[in-house]
Amino acid sequence: MRQNYDDRKIVKQYREIARQIVKKEGLYKNMEQAELCEQTNFWREKFKTKPMTDRDKINIFALAREAASRIIGLDAVVVQLIGALVLGDGKVAEMKTGEGKTLMSLFVMFIEVMRGNRVHLVTANEYLARRDREEIGQVLEYLGVSVALNESGLDIAQKKAIYTADVIYGTASEFGFDYLRDNMVRQKEDKVQSGLDFVLIDEADSILIDEARTPLLISDRKEEDLSLYHTANKLVKKMMKDDYEMEEHKRFVWLNDAGIEKAQKFWGVESLYSAEAQSELRITMLLMRAHFLMHKDKDYVVLDDEVLIIDPHTGRALPGRRFNDGLHQAIEAKEGVEVKEESRTLATITIQNYFRMYKKISGMTGTAKTEEEEFRQIYNMDVVVIPTNLRVNREDMQDDIFYTKKEKGRAIVYEVSWRYEKGQPTLIGTSSIKSNEWISGLLDAAGIPHQVLNAKNHAQEAEIIAKAGKRGMVTLATNMAGRGTDIKLDPDVHKLGGLAVIGTERHESRRIDLQLMGRSGRRGDPGFSKFMISLEDDLLEQFESKSWEKLSAKLKRKAPRDGKPVNSRKIHAVVVDAQKRLEGANYDIRKDLLSYDEVIDLQRKMVYKERDLLLERNKLGVSSEKILREVAEYSFIHPSDIPEEELEIYYSRQKELLGGTKFPISFDQVTLMEPREVVEEIVSWHKKERNKFPAETIAAIEREVYLNLMDQMWVMHLDAMVQLREGIHLRAYGQQDPLVMYQKEGAQLFEKFQADYHFYFAHALLELDPDGLIQG
């Protein structure tokens, strides 16, 4: 993307500072390593008591620049230093691929460590985390900064050691899961993650935007009747288009009146929306989503009788990840593979809410400007476009638009064939495995050798990308296209025009298109890019516009079918409009996810704060007597103050509180006593029993029981919130705002959760036996 006025103003301001850093080249040239480490210690100490000035920044950057020159032989250029200064301001730096973001990261991490902050560097996958830790980590270590790699599968001792480092490399999911696991431990000493000071996110658009739709979940197996999925599958397979309505770009499908009648008859229920039919309704809707909204080889792939999610933005399969809330089971039933048990959520957080907990956040990527509004609205981060060190020498052509996919396919083969014959390497980008395999078949038929990269063979990704710049190489890839890895050109390829990139479809996001184009023309290399699309592509097929439908019909009816592309400004405008609308729809989905998660986020913070206090104090924050009194007063009210229809519930609660406990007064006697008298008897008896224990023993017992009950009830509460979220759209569609209903009913569920674990804690207090143990 081009710079706007604000970008140019910021870049101009920092260009002068960057030039001064370069001028300091000789400042540390003659120092030994020990002397450089002394400088590091000097700056660390200084900023414990004093603020950092621009002059300080210049000297610190110059120190890191000298170390990088010695250890990895790279001298940071002015634009890399500008980018690092932008990152230091808590912004997103958009820097073209191949311009040296990895080296740029060194400077902002080093300066944040000098400020006294712990730094987390987040990458898209563990391979990149390991690679960057080895390359830049050695420079930081040369300067006396400790560096660690946060990997999955480590034990608590190993994790604790990692989190003592100044700089930690890892993936978003691993840092997020460490946070969730920390809030499930039973002892303070088992927590591993230290403070969330500063995070630098590589491929920020991928992590903060693309991955934001999938929350992080820690779960276990949930018992349920899996046969319902197979039964519902039979119903949905028989459904006709007249039975349901659908908005595919919003990922929403629902039954119309005919469909409701058919489903009620199938399940044998009077009303599908009655409380008794909630399971049947839920699973029917899940199977409808699986059949009508989730597409094989686009949203998921079936490998070795297992359904694997495909990341829509990279094209990679995601082993171990499952769609939540029963959707994965529905897809398994649809595909006729084993339906595995649904998981029960133990802890969850969205990527958005995890990273918003950091005191400071920065990001770097090759494509972010198109999503600046989202970065600003959700993360309070501006996007600044960093100029390239060398002029981009890639020729970007206007789209070729064809009437049909068949015509497009023929044109792609012709385009690739003549480039192949002259030896120019070509990268063909597709948006799905299905389209990837279709183009591959056309190339095979034309006798053009090529290598294929998609979710089915992602294990060979590094090897395939390494060969993509060789003379005469044709590479066919889904969106992944080796992001994070350079395509290096053979020396004799430059004179052939560099790497040619052919896009076979416009994606839902312009950003993904820019990423594909950015594979070519790196670091001043020559290159070429062009999109070859058709009126039958998914982007236009799902674009809902009456004016477009008329134009499309007119073009298909009147235009000559000679296989040549259509040059129409109107069609180009429609493509851009369709992308913008879908970007807006996807942004709304992510905002919607965040809005719903903010309800849980507030509740989660309250629960985790109470847990932390329990672990810190090693005893209850309030007296057990106070909790017992509140529960008893709530449970024992004069019958005349209770509505007649609630009397049965009232007596049941009393029986549940006292039943099976050591409380010496029988329930028959209790019913003859005044409520206030019962409360005082309960509290005084508990006080007498409690005093029989050593103070430390009873405090430990109460803490353990309270923590255990709170954790158990929290899991049940999360499950209830999931059920509420699923049902709220079904009940509210076309009526009241579902988010408002969710907020209101979610707050009521949270109050119930708090009341429940206090109630069962009070019950446990009345189970204290003479030996100091709690029964049950």
From Swiss-Prot:
It is a peripheral membrane protein. One of its GO terms (cellular component) is cytoplasm. It holds the Pfam family SecA_SW. It catalyses: ATP + H2O + cellular proteinSide 1 = ADP + phosphate + cellular proteinSide 2. The keyword Repressor does not apply. Disruption phenotype: Knockout causes a smooth to rough phenotype transition; cells grow as filaments longer than 10 um in length with septa between cells but no indentations. Knockout also causes a smooth to rough phenotype transition; cells grow as filaments longer than 10 um in length with septa between cells but no indentations. Keywords: ATP-binding, Cell membrane, Cytoplasm, Dwarfism, Membrane, Nucleotide-binding, Protein transport, Translocase, Translocation, Transport. PROSITE patterns: SECA_MOTOR_DEAD (PS51196). SMART domains: SecA_DEAD (SM00957), SecA_PP_bind (SM00958). Its EC number is 7.4.2.8. Part of the Sec protein translocase complex. Interacts with the SecYEG preprotein conducting channel. Has a central role in coupling the hydrolysis of ATP to the transfer of proteins into and across the cell membrane, serving as an ATP-driven molecular motor driving the stepwise translocation of polypeptide chains across the membrane. PANTHER family: CHLOROPLAST PROTEIN-TRANSPORTING ATPASE (PTHR30612:SF0), SECA INNER MEMBRANE COMPONENT OF SEC PROTEIN SECRETION SYSTEM (PTHR30612). Belongs to the SecA family. Monomer and homodimer. Part of the essential Sec protein translocation apparatus which comprises SecA, SecYEG and auxiliary proteins SecDF. Other proteins may also be involved. This is Protein translocase subunit SecA 2.
